[in-house]
Amino acid sequence: MALRRPMVAGNWKMNGSAALAQELFKKFASKLQNDSAEVVLCPPSIYLESVRQLLEANKEALDGSLVRMGAQNLSQHDFGAYTGEVSGQMLKDCGCRYVIIGHSERRRMYGETSNIVAEKFAAAQKHGLTPILCVGESGPAREARRTFEVIAEELDIVIQKNGTMAFDNAIIAYEPLWAVGTGKSATPEQAQEVHAFIRKRLSEVSPFIGENIRILYGGSVTPSNAADLFAQPDVDGGLIGGASLNSTEFLSLCTIAMSA
């Protein structure tokens, strides 16, 4: 069985501040002292440089731990007249290692189709970034027993446009839309069922990818439910929203992942 290092990725969305970043790093420096889990901070783009500077300033204190920086979105284009957009190369220049692709809020609020998501996935990898690909079903889709169908479609478009081996450098985050930002989390059993399906789906085209890819759960993860979620055999950590804005809760989630 593959040894997949757990990951806790904090998606601040359009929240947070430079002060929050400083508070997080102060706690990281004193309490985050091993590399059994990878921690990724995904602040708004305006704060990427602040986080990069904090990573550099705390390099010695964080020695032995794995704290990385990621972005919440990128353009599928390399450059051009795309006002307000940020390219993969720009994120790489800022020090990002990861970028969230296809978050449900981007799909729903900004009309990002699965084809656009697949293009952004490719753009991230072109510039040396690891995409964190979000997939998940709506409440009505789950009630209609279409969860697997929806997720298969979202995965298959990325595979068709980028090839199976593109997932050798990717993370998948399962985020049921009915749980994102609602305070209602999937049960550990529900999460495991979907994660196992995703792993099996990828294993059908590449056993190596299926066994080794990390699959995160995202959807109202808190310190009270994280241990049970992270204990599931196919759950490799979490994509954290609201709890990532509370330094105490986020550090608790990191600690739970380290012992998962």
Swiss-Prot record:
It catalyses: D-glyceraldehyde 3-phosphate = dihydroxyacetone phosphate. Pathway: Carbohydrate biosynthesis; gluconeogenesis; Carbohydrate degradation; glycolysis; D-glyceraldehyde 3-phosphate from glycerone phosphate: step 1/1. GO terms for biological process: gluconeogenesis; glyceraldehyde-3-phosphate biosynthetic process; glycerol catabolic process; glycolytic process. Keywords: Cytoplasm, Gluconeogenesis, Glycolysis, Isomerase. Its EC number is 5.3.1.1. The active site is at 103 (electrophile), 175 (proton acceptor). One of its GO terms (cellular component) is cytosol. It holds the Pfam family TIM. Substrate binds at residues 11-13, 181, 220, 241-242. It comes from the Bacteria. InterPro entries: Aldolase_TIM (IPR013785), TIM_sf (IPR035990), TrioseP_Isoase_bac/euk (IPR022896), Triosephosphate_isomerase (IPR000652), Triosephosphate_isomerase_AS (IPR020861). PROSITE patterns: TIM_1 (PS00171), TIM_2 (PS51440). SUPFAM superfamilies: Triosephosphate isomerase (TIM). One of its GO terms (molecular function) is triose-phosphate isomerase activity. It is found in: Cytoplasm. Homodimer. Belongs to the triosephosphate isomerase family. PANTHER family: TRIOSEPHOSPHATE ISOMERASE. Involved in the gluconeogenesis. Catalyzes stereospecifically the conversion of dihydroxyacetone phosphate (DHAP) to D-glyceraldehyde-3-phosphate (G3P). NCBIfam families: tim (TIGR00419). This is Triosephosphate isomerase.
